[in-house]
Amino acid sequence: GLWQKIKSAAGDLASGIVEAIKS
């Protein structure tokens, strides 16, 4: 549902931030 899409998008954003910090 919509909530799952929101959680997925938030997870992708968080992963991107983590990768940016690590690199």
From Swiss-Prot:
It comes from Ranoidea caerulea (Green tree frog). This is Caerin-4.2. Keywords: Amphibian defense peptide, Antibiotic, Antimicrobial, Secreted. One of its GO terms (cellular component) is extracellular region. GO terms for biological process: defense response to bacterium. It is found in: Secreted. Belongs to the frog skin active peptide (FSAP) family. Caerin subfamily. The lineage of its organism: Eukaryota, Metazoa, Chordata, Craniata, Vertebrata. Expressed by the skin parotoid and/or rostral glands.
